[in-house]
Amino acid sequence: MKTGIVTTLIALCLPVSVFATTLRLSTDVDLLVLDGKKVSSSLLRGADSIELDNGPHQLVFRVEKTIHLSNSEERLYISPPLVVSFNTQLINQVNFRLPRLENEREANHFDAAPHLELLDGDATPIPVKLDILAITSTAKTIDYEVEVERYNKSAKRASLPQFATMMADDSTLLSGVSELDAIPPQSQVLTEQRLKYWFKLADPQTRNTFLQWAEKQPSS
């Protein structure tokens, strides 16, 4: 099983389309959802960037940073989930620029009025729409895909309805089932399709790191 997955992932290294924009990841940003799809944290762990095509995009993320307290101690600050939408048309690189977040006062100010910039490769600000993702679920584990779908259907400041339509069900991710030798349970198919999706977005170094990790995993 492991060999089959690795072989499939190696095949995905072959170019299938031309990506035009590199999203540089920040160590202070925990990316949760990209364009309506949950981010594969295991695949992106340690990645410096992911590749995007030209056009509108939407990120859902939290800012996570160690801040200093008045008693000389430290704590991990975690922001509420934020939504930012932007367009990468004619842009080859996107970089995060966060405000100063070093102490409790600055963290509280950011909670009350989040603000940040996305910069292109020339350090020019990219027009963005930023909002807080209000979580409606009371479940212990939050399904961010569901929350983002609800948000995108509600005509909020940073909503992009086209991503709500894409995530109404997983039919787009399941459309490639026919390429498998046998039809496994839907949950397994969906997991594989999601893995393929994020593998294709990852930069070459991240792909290689993931493949090396996959080779070391025990066969099921």
Swiss-Prot record:
The keyword Coiled coil does not apply. InterPro entries: UPF0319. Keywords: Signal. Residues 1-20 form the signal peptide. It holds the Pfam family DUF2057. It comes from the Bacteria. Belongs to the UPF0319 family. HAMAP family: UPF0319. This is UPF0319 protein YccT. It comes from Escherichia coli (strain 55989 / EAEC). The gene is yccT.
